[in-house]
């Protein structure tokens, strides 16, 4: 009799635990993913991209794809987006290529896409020292003394920048931006050519703001050995090494 009561108690306890776990599962089913879960999913996507761009052997010329693209304003540097914003898929039909470095949604200009992980690393990793040149319209009239700070490196929130090549340049002949840049009529603007040997998030914008001259328009003109040439916004061409 005692043995049977013990068995019944154990069974009841087990049923209670199962019921508890079912209730928790039902409760959590309608909840949005936690920050930790979102981070895990993001890391998986990042690792998948890195794997796709890290072939175990060098690609042959026939296998390698290299695309030069003039990214328009208000376009994401990726092929998918769940919010209906413009992406690379709106312009480029070629599959299995990935952007070597990114451009912010509100930046324009040269984006290089490739399926070659070795080339992607050569263009983006700091130790490779591939130069990236930007044409930057800033608010105000910086003097040489202002630009010297960028040439020697400035300290941003994520640390000091490497010395940059910075020159005042004539206003380039460009396509109109849509929507147009919003100017303040009483304040002049200046165009700068800025060449970096590194690439951090919104680095050029933060650098010009650091010396007191906010960026109004930013166009990447060249990256490594390639430049925009005569590509218009939304146009692309395939090149060979």
Swiss-Prot record:
Entry GO MF terms: 23S rRNA pseudouridine(2457) synthase activity; RNA binding
Regions that span the bilayer: none
Name this polypeptide is given: Ribosomal large subunit pseudouridine synthase E
One GO BP annotation of this record: rRNA processing
Active site: 104
Pfam families: PseudoU_synth_2
Reactions catalysed, as given in the entry: uridine(2457) in 23S rRNA = pseudouridine(2457) in 23S rRNA
Basic residues: bias regions: 36-47
